[in-house]
A protein has these predicted regions:
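Periplasmic peptidoglycan-binding/tethering modules of Gram-negative envelope proteins
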Residues: 19-89
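Extracytoplasmic/secreted proteins, especially bacterial periplasmic and envelope-associated proteins
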Residues: 70, 74-77, 103, 111, ...
Length: 161
């Protein structure tokens, strides 16, 4: 009986030793890839599509809510993108840097979001497709008390709903 168990265990060990190793996974490509097998695909009409096609944010000068020429170009691309996807709605988030009171920055963030919305509406996008919200200084993109951080935080971000 002991010999049979030993023979059976030996056979199992031989079978296990003969099994082939698992195949190697394919090499990882750069994020966003070229659309080949295994790369991340951007879904048309998605937030990622908006970011890649038009850009999702514009920036403002200190304590300002007027639209710069660069911001106007981004909003023009966003309007073109929104025309391609007539069923998509968006929310424009207004943001500020950390300077100023909470109340002041909430109001300034709302003016920034509304200014961006006004440009999109003037470009032919129905106002009913665009909502606005202000986060003031509550959601910084960059944490820090430098001019570079402040500049990145004074923004309006268009978010696909």
């Amino acid at each position: 009986m002991h010999a049979k168990i030993t023979a059976l265990l030996g056979a199992l060990l031989l079978l296990a030793a003969c099994s082939s190793p698992p195949p190697e996974p394919p090499p990882a490509g750069p994020p966003g890839g070229s659309g080949g097998a295994g790369s991340r695909t951007i879904v048309p009409g998605s937030q990622q599509d908006l970011e890649a096609s038009a850009g999702d944010r514009i920036f403002f000068a200190f304590d300002r809510s007027d639209i710069s020429p660069e911001a106007r170009e981004t909003l023009s691309r966003q309007a073109d993108w929104l025309r391609r996807y007539p069923n998509v709605t968006v929310t424009i988030e207004g943001h500020c840097d950390e300077r100023g009171t909470r109340e002041y920055n909430l109001a300034l963030g709302e003016r920034r979001a509304q200014a961006a919305k006004n440009v999109l509406v003037a470009s032919g996008i129905p106002a009913s497709r665009i909502s606005t919200i202000s986060y003031g200084k509550e959601r910084p993109a960059v944490v820090g008390s430098t001019e570079e951080a402040y500049a990145q935080n004074r923004r309006a971000v268009t978010v696909v709903n």
